[in-house]
């Protein structure tokens, strides 16, 4: 395959995604095929987002790293020193992707490191490794193209996370604002009693201790449940099982109590 055909192969993989999230494993496999190298897509914290192996490396530490999907912390931190594509790093470098304890087995091992940037910040690193053959300009063009695609995908995921967090917070705030003063007081006592995100409570006991009617507690729980903030289930004489579904709820409740 020439460079154009290889680029088209990456494009075909992207078009197949058709607006859906790009699978980092598929991206790594496509780059592995067109560049003919081992490919590792690593997050800024060393998490292995995707990888594909062209030449198997028989080393226990490497096998464990792939199973755990986590690069060593020290190595991950060092990667931040590389701010532009660094091709054909040999086995003696601290940046080599080959196991240094087996240098003799991988004397011809070469590593190429491509920073993944986006939105003005470092998002991760694309690491390529292979034996015997140097990475040429065509390989580097494909690697940098791949790193750009991965960077855009990481940014999209981050934007979705921020959006989801804002949505969760808004739902909680609306649910809490729908509670009357006595219902809010009841909810505060309920979650003091639970001491966590789920558990059993006996509504009548709380009602007696706080000095409110049981119906106030029932109404408060119903409002939170209809908003999707909690789920509750009656267990008869044992009481009511409650579980928090929205992780922003307890934080917002704590803010109200301390304000």
Swiss-Prot record:
SUPFAM superfamilies: Winged helix' DNA-binding domain
Keywords: Cytoplasm, DNA-binding, Phosphoprotein, Repressor, Transcription, Transcription regulation
A single GO BP: negative regulation of DNA-templated transcription
Keyword Ribonucleoprotein: no
DNA-binding region: 203-222
Major localisation: cytoplasm
Organismal lineage: Bacteria, Bacillati, Bacillota, Bacilli, Bacillales
Residues modified to Phosphoserine: 215
Gene3D superfamilies linked: 3.30.450.40, Winged helix-like DNA-binding domain superfamily/Winged helix DNA-binding domain
PANTHER family (alphabetical): GLOBAL TRANSCRIPTIONAL REGULATOR CODY, GTP-SENSING TRANSCRIPTIONAL PLEIOTROPIC REPRESSOR CODY
The family this protein is said to belong to: Belongs to the CodY family.
Protein name per its UniProtKB record: Global transcriptional regulator CodY
HAMAP family in the record: HTH_type_CodY
GO cellular component: cytoplasm
Places the protein is found: Cytoplasm
Region (GAF domain): 1-155
Function per UniProt: DNA-binding global transcriptional regulator which is involved in the adaptive response to starvation and acts by directly or indirectly controlling the expression of numerous genes in response to nutrient availability. During rapid exponential growth, CodY is highly active and represses genes whose products allow adaptation to nutrient depletion.
GO molecular function per UniProt: DNA binding; DNA-binding transcription factor activity; GTP binding
UniProt KW Transport keyword: no
């Amino acid at each position: 395959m020439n460079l154009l055909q290889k680029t088209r192969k990456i494009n075909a993989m992207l078009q197949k995604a058709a607006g859906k999230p790009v699978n980092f494993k598929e991206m790594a496999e496509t780059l592995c095929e067109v560049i003919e190298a081992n490919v590792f897509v690593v997050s800024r914290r060393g998490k292995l987002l995707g990888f594909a192996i062209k030449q198997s490396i028989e080393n226990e530490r490497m096998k464990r790293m792939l199973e755990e999907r986590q690069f060593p912390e020290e190595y991950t931190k060092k990667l931040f020193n590389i701010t532009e594509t660094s091709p054909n790093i040999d086995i003696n470098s601290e940046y080599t992707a080959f196991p240094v304890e087996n240098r003799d087995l991988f004397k011809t091992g070469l590593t190429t490191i491509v920073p993944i940037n986006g939105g003005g910040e470092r998002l991760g690193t694309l690491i390529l490794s292979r034996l015997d053959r140097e990475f040429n300009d065509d390989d580097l063009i494909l690697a940098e193209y791949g790193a750009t695609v991965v960077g855009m995908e990481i940014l999209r995921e981050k934007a979705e996370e921020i959006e989801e967090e804002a949505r969760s917070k808004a739902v909680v705030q609306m649910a809490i604002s729908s509670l009357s003063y006595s219902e809010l007081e009841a909810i505060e006592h309920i979650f003091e009693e639970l001491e966590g995100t789920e558990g059993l409570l006996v509504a009548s006991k709380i009602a007696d201790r706080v000095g409110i009617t049981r119906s106030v507690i029932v109404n408060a729980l119903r409002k939170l449940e209809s908003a999707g903030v909690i789920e509750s289930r009656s267990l008869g004489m044992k009481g009511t099982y409650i579980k928090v579904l929205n992780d922003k709820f307890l934080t917002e409740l704590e803010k109200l109590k301390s304000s």
